[in-house]
Curated annotation (Swiss-Prot):
Cited PANTHER family: RIBOSOMAL PROTEIN S7 (PTHR11205)
Family: Belongs to the universal ribosomal protein uS7 family.
Protein name, per record: Small ribosomal subunit protein uS7
Role description: One of the primary rRNA binding proteins, it binds directly to 16S rRNA where it nucleates assembly of the head domain of the 30S subunit. Is located at the subunit interface close to the decoding center.
Species of origin: Archaeoglobus fulgidus (strain ATCC 49558 / DSM 4304 / JCM 9628 / NBRC 100126 / VC-16)
Lineage start: Archaea, Methanobacteriati, Methanobacteriota, Archaeoglobi, Archaeoglobales
Gene (name only): rps7
Keywords: Ribonucleoprotein, Ribosomal protein, RNA-binding, rRNA-binding
Database matches in InterPro entries: Ribosomal_uS7, Ribosomal_uS7_arc, Ribosomal_uS7_CS, Ribosomal_uS7_dom, Ribosomal_uS7_dom_sf, Ribosomal_uS7_euk/arc
Stretches of the chain forming a coiled coil according to its record: none
Amino acid sequence: MKYGFTKEELLVFGKYDPSEVQISDPALESYICLEPKYVPHNHGRHANVPFAKQKVFIVERLINKVMRKGHNTGKKILAYNIVKEAFEIIEKKTKKNPIQVLVDAIINAGPREEVVRLKYGGIAVPKAVDTSSSRRVDIALRNIAEGARRAAFKSKRSIAQCLADEIIAAANNESRSFAVAKKEEVERVAKSAR
């Protein structure tokens, strides 16, 4: 019994156990929080505290990214239901724990190297730099949500189906995933700017 709840009550969406999830990238272990919550909603308590977002449950962070812009701004229950439906689709298609698939997708979609612009005597010079683990998780989640949003735009498929396909493709490291394609593009530019 943890935090006054039984183990059955702390399953994500009442179905998925985060305790059996393995994080294969040691650099991201302390930045992907798998501590379950009864309801994945912390009322933005992490907003003004430095580095507090790494203690926010990873499923809640995905829900927040899905809620991000346009018609879905501020509609957390809608975003919650989208992610819940996407997880059900992922479980049907892959026969795996959807949280494990999401973690694999984040590991594959986070860029390891980026480009910054340095100014030398009025001339901007691109320079390749390593990406921090926290930023890797942020960019991966943002690109997964953005890829789902773009795939669902002017499409018959629901955003939940598009989100599920995006997460599965990113977990398999396929280039048809928007997030993986974006990561490869950023790393290619960084390689040329070394």
